[in-house]
Amino acid sequence: LNPPAQVWADMGISERMGDVLGQAVESKPLKEVQEHPEKVTHLAIIMDGNRRFAWKSKIATGLGHRIGKQKLETVLDWVLELNIPWFTVYALSTENLTRPQEELDILFKLYIEGLRDIAEDERIHANEVKVQIIGRRELLPEDVNEAIDYAENKTAAYDKYVFTVCLAYGSREEMLNAIQSIAAEHAAGDLPLDAIDETAV
């Protein structure tokens, strides 16, 4: 979805011209996927730039995040339209948890709202989309975890599509955990040194 009329107005752009610009930006990645010589089976995106967009547009940071959430719904439509079975969104890294609490509260509220909405979304059930969340859930508030459980439980039986949301997730931490796990297996005598290869990692 394109930013609301007030956002375009604040940027000195008419609502109609804003719609044209938004559609032009949206059509490019969609066209690239459609014209790719090989079928795309996994689309992964990083939810980044909402704050910068808000600052440049001179709107509240919270509104920038909400516009980003709306854009995600558009991308989900693309995924279903193009029949891409795996869709992953990197929404919140562990590093992001150091942001001001006021901004985190806005994000957590959006996650709760989004997870509960998607659990009831007709598109999700009609297309049998399994929703799963990965990351360090112990770092998230209880109400966010409750929304995660709700969305996962409502879609647990589906397997046609998999929609993964990364919350409180960090790739560096994941690599560290993998290294620690391999070291523990080796120390216990369950994994010989010469057996540690790309497959083990």
Segments predicted by a language model, with ranges:
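Flexible, compositionally biased loop and terminal segments
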Residues: 1-201
